[in-house]
Amino acid sequence: MVKLVFARHGESEWNKANLFTGWADVDLSEKGTQQAIDAGKLIKEAGIAFDLAFTSVLKRAIKTTNLALEYSDQLWVPVEKSWRLNERHYGGLTGKNKAEAAEQFGDEQVHIWRRSYDVLPPDMAKDDEHSAHTDRRYAHLDHSVIPDAENLKVTLERALPFWEDKIAPALVDGKNVFVGAHGNSIRALVKHIKQLSDDEIMNVEIPNFPPLVFEFDDKLNLTAEYYLGGE
C-alpha cells in the first residue's frame, strides 16, 4: 500500500487579503507558515515516510514543502520542482480583490470564472508585472505553452503529463510521494485520480490545511482517502 500526500500551500499573503493569486509568486503569511509546520508534525505523527517529493515553482508551495518535510524529519527527501504543478493561472483577475471583482463583473460571472470547469477568465496582458512571459523561471518554455489564463480543464491538461511521467510511476514503483502544490492544481489531479465528472469537481475544495492522503494498491487503484488529523 503506497501513500500520496497532497499538501496545499499554507495561507498566502494574498489569500489573507482575498486576492486572486494564480501564478503570482506570493509568500506565505505567518498563519500559512504555521500551517506548513503543523502539516509536517501531522505527517510525523502519522508515521508517513516519503521517498520523494514534488512541488511547483512558486515560493508558497516550495516553502510549504520544505517546512512539511523539515518538521516531519524528512528534509533530506529529494524534491523536484515543476511549473506543471503551479496554481491555475487566473489571467486578468490576478491581483484583483475577489469582492471588488464581483462588484465590477457581477457575482454570477465571477462565480462562473472561479468554479466552472471550462470557462476561461480574461487573459492577462503580456506586459503585466506578473506575466510569466518575462519571468526567468519559465525561460526554458516555449511561449506558446505559457498561459495567459486558465480554467480547471486547462490546468488539468497542464498537470496531467507530470502525473503520468513522474507521480504515477513513482507510486507504481512502491514509493510514498509528497506533493506540495495549490488548490486548483490539486483539484485537477483529484478529478483525474477519482474520475470525477466536470460537475462533481466544482464542489470539491482543497483547504490550506491539513494534508490530504490517498492510498493506492500496487495497480494504482485508490483504496483510501482521508485528511491527516481526522478532518
From Swiss-Prot:
Substrate binds at residues 8-15, 21-22, 60, 87-90, 98, 114-115, 183-184. InterPro entries: His_Pase_superF_clade-1 (IPR013078), His_PPase_superfam (IPR029033), Phosphogly_mut1 (IPR005952). Keywords: Gluconeogenesis, Glycolysis, Isomerase. It catalyses: (2R)-2-phosphoglycerate = (2R)-3-phosphoglycerate. It comes from the Bacteria. Catalyzes the interconversion of 2-phosphoglycerate and 3-phosphoglycerate. This is 2,3-bisphosphoglycerate-dependent phosphoglycerate mutase. It comes from Streptococcus equi subsp. zooepidemicus (strain MGCS10565). The lineage of its organism: Bacteria, Bacillati, Bacillota, Bacilli, Lactobacillales.
